[in-house]
Amino acid sequence: MKVVLIVCLVWVMAMMELVSCECWSQADCSDGHCCAGSSFSKNCRPYGGDGEQCGPRNKYEVYSTGCPYEENLMCSVINRCQSA
């Protein structure tokens, strides 16, 4: 029984790793996504759509609160995507 529980726990942890799409840099993420999060826990997240949380674009491609906005949008002063 303990072996089954351990195997299940390892499987769940492996699935969480796949779903979270952890990243170290922008190169680790697919198109339409950016690498964002704290120094210790970065994940590939989609670019912000209308009304969603965003962060301003920067030349270093380092984002903590959210990805930049999609094309034809801008990031407001309250870090929400809106029409340009």
From Swiss-Prot:
It comes from the Eukaryota. Keywords: Disulfide bond, Secreted, Signal, Toxin. Pfam families: Prokineticin (PF06607). Expressed by the venom gland. Disulfide bonds join C23-C35, C29-C44, C34-C67, C54-C75. Its main location: secreted. The keyword Amino-acid biosynthesis does not apply. The keyword Hydrolase does not apply. InterPro entries: Prokineticin_domain. GO terms for cellular component: extracellular region. Residues 1-21 form the signal peptide. GO terms for molecular function: toxin activity. It is found in: Secreted. Belongs to the AVIT (prokineticin) family. This is U8-theraphotoxin-Hhn1b. The lineage of its organism: Eukaryota, Metazoa, Ecdysozoa, Arthropoda, Chelicerata.
